[in-house]
A protein has these predicted regions:
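Short S/T/G/P-rich N-terminal loop/turn motif that feeds into the first structured element of a domain
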Residues: 1-54, 59-71, 92-98
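C-terminal structural segments of small proteins and small subunits
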Residues: 66, 71-85, 89
Length: 98
């Protein structure tokens, strides 16, 4: 567990693309288990008033697990779709506290 990282990912859809953003994320998040990573939490909002459309909390076994996921050819093959539907992404490390 010493190398484990937890991330918060906030995503904003391009105009009219909130459903397409969710569909894209459904596809790419399904790849996480292949890279020793998982979704801890995923919430979807309206994106109103400048808020993100989707917020995810992800756990990866290590930085190399995250790097493997980000470089997965199944994911990178969808980069045009990602660029079309996602206007902005913020990804940063967090500590989960209950």
């Amino acid at each position: 567990m010493g190398n484990e990282i937890t991330l918060c990912c906030m995503l904003w859809a391009g105009p009219g693309n909130s459903a397409a953003l969710t569909a894209y994320e459904d596809t790419v998040l399904a790849l996480l288990p292949d890279h020793d990573a998982e979704v801890l939490s995923r919430v979807v909002g309206t994106g109103a008033d400048g808020h993100p459309h989707e917020v995810q909390i992800l756990r990866c076994a290590s930085r190399s697990a995250l790097d493997g996921y980000l470089a997965d050819p199944r994911r990178t093959a969808l980069s045009d779709e990602r660029d079309r539907v996602i206007a902005r992404t913020e990804l940063f490390e967090v500590d989960v506290r209950v």
